Amino acid sequence: MLRLFRFDVLETSTKDTERPNSKSSRLSSTSGSSHPSSSSRLTVRSAVPEKSAFGSIEFIFYFSVILSILTIACFKIHYVSSPKHPNYKNIEKYLKPGWLFGQKVDSADFQYSAFRENMPILLLVIIVYNFLWRLVKLVFTKNTNDELAIKNNYRLCFSLLFALLVYGTGVIYVLTIALINYLISKSLKNSIFNPLLTWTLDISVVFFKEYFAYCKFSSLHPGLGFLDQYTGILERWYVLFNITMLRLVSFNMDYYWSLKHNSEKLNTLIFDKDREPTTLTFRERVDYSCLDEDYNLKNFLTYIFYAPLYLAGPIISFNNFMSQMKYPTVSTLKYRNLLYAIRFLVCVLTMEFLLHYAYVTAISKDGNWNQYSAVESAMISFIVLFMTWLKLLIPWRLFRLWSLIDDIEPPENIVRCMCNNYSAVGFWRAWHRSFNRWLIRYIYVPLGGSNHSILNLFIIFTFVALWHDISWELFAWGWLIVLFILPERLCCFMSRRTGLTKHPYYRYISGFGAALNIYFMIICNLIGFAVGIDGIKNVLVSFFLTLKGAMSAIAAFIMFFSAVQIMFQIRVNEEEEGINLRC
């Protein structure tokens, strides 16, 4: 049972150790300071007790506080979701018949509801994909030793068919944009116009993607009108194009850097330095360039349309993807994929339980906050945020599980529970981890890294908001995160400069600041992903400007402080095991 929750179930590269003379170590030493919050790790180490203390009276008190408040929260959520509540009649329209003990299910989140309904189809596709591969392997690999080449051809063929099934003739638009990107990279090579045109084209498509709704084949030529009838499962191909855009930039930039800097090749590392391919670290697979001939059209199309990761990610760079097509990763953990599948199932069942017993999404969608007390509003908001985290986690892990079964290991998008974060930067690293790594590699470091950190953070989170969708809520979310990151970084810097980190009570001082940080992060993410700007006004007024609300805010702060002390200790235990997630 304990094996199920080991970190190497999530990611093979989590416990990779960098070799002191490797290129990855040199890159780490130069770019580590360029990371948006390399200082946050120091805060953790300084702020924690030196040995595990979960059995001490202090930590028993912390656990008691958290358990007490969570018990109250459960009763409150059960009440607001029951027919006894006065506002139940207004949220009932968002409820559908469920399968769990006669309870109705909350279907107010249309995006997750659509995924939930189509999950059996996706599972069937995964089974068919692996069955067909075994059939192809049986037929075509009898007289050849080049099994990997055949598998890569199979990946390409299936991925193109999968894209056609999903988008129908809309895949023609995606293919056209992809080929234009490929022509840019191949014609401009190491010219500065390669990245300039790549970024201009792809950001323009993301920005104006809604206009593609009005673009029909019949408007190009009446004879092409029949193509408009075959729209596929997802009629609007441009809705999920954002993920494809990241891959297009990755291919062009990796190819550009391989030529521009005459980067050392991965094959050189393996053969000239006598390295076993199975010992390659994640960083080495990303930083070392592929051979020039690997940046070809077939590999490009396989990477862009790779079926397991096509719809939602996680994001994997072209260099990493190509290296794994040639030298697959090997986990040292027995039955790793099975354990990962069990963890995925636990997440799905947790979500199902919440959807059947906590109708917080329906309450949030209804928006009638006046019907709820300050405590209830706070509990509803927190559970909405937790379910937002879960609704992203589940699709990411399903598609990543498919990829793992296919011997391609992308980064794990979420390595910590939402409730196990106290740093704004650490939270971002652990929330959409593969996207965070993409941002660092393709935006933050090229723009100068920590030399212009504040400006770069503003640019990055503006891009992230634009990438998600063009809305004031998301722009407010991005800019508020930058605003809240600045005092966190300033406090970390001043603590080290003044020697406060050596103070015996620094753990408690740091815990106080981290508890405030949690408040800020909850507010930001509620604005961006849950209740919006209008909704957050009602929550904040009821929570901070009423007597009962203020008392609840104090109780929540005590719980956050207690939780932070436990988070500190968790990270101490991880470091003792050689795990440093830097979040």
Swiss-Prot record:
Q: What is its main location?
A: membrane
What domain of life does the UniProt record list for this protein's source? Eukaryota
Q: How does it sit in the membrane?
A: Multi-pass membrane protein
**Keyword Transport assigned:** no
Which residue intervals make up region (Disordered)?
Answer: 15-42
Name the Gene Ontology molecular function terms of this record: O-acyltransferase activity
User: Subcellular location, in the record's words?
Assistant: Cell membrane; Endoplasmic reticulum membrane; Mitochondrion membrane
Q: Which residues cross the membrane?
A: 53-73, 120-140, 160-180, 192-212, 299-319, 344-364, 374-394, 445-465, 466-486, 513-533, 550-570
InterPro entries, A to Z: MB_O-acyltransferase, MBOAT_fam
Keyword S-adenosyl-L-methionine, does the record have it? no
Positions on the Extracellular side per record topology:
1-52, 141-159, 213-298, 365-373, 534-549
List UniProt keywords, sorted A-Z: Acyltransferase, Cell membrane, Endoplasmic reticulum, Membrane, Mitochondrion, Transferase, Transmembrane, Transmembrane helix
Gene Ontology CC annotations of this record? cytosol; endoplasmic reticulum; endoplasmic reticulum membrane; mitochondrial membrane; plasma membrane
Bias kind Low complexity: ranges: 22-40
Q: Name one GO biological process term.
A: GPI anchor biosynthetic process
* Cytoplasmic compartment residues: 74-119, 181-191, 320-343, 395-444, 487-512, 571-583
Active site: which residues? H468
Q: Could you say which protein family the record assigns here?
A: Belongs to the membrane-bound acyltransferase family.
Q: What does this protein do?
A: Membrane-bound O-acyltransferase involved in the remodeling of glycosylphosphatidylinositol (GPI) anchors. Acts only on GPI-anchored proteins, but not on free GPI lipids. Also involved in lipid metabolism, having profound effects on sphingolipid-sterol-ordered domains integrity and assembly. Involved in cell integrity and apoptosis.
Q: What protein does this entry describe?
A: Membrane-bound O-acyltransferase gup1
Q: Which gene encodes it?
A: gup1
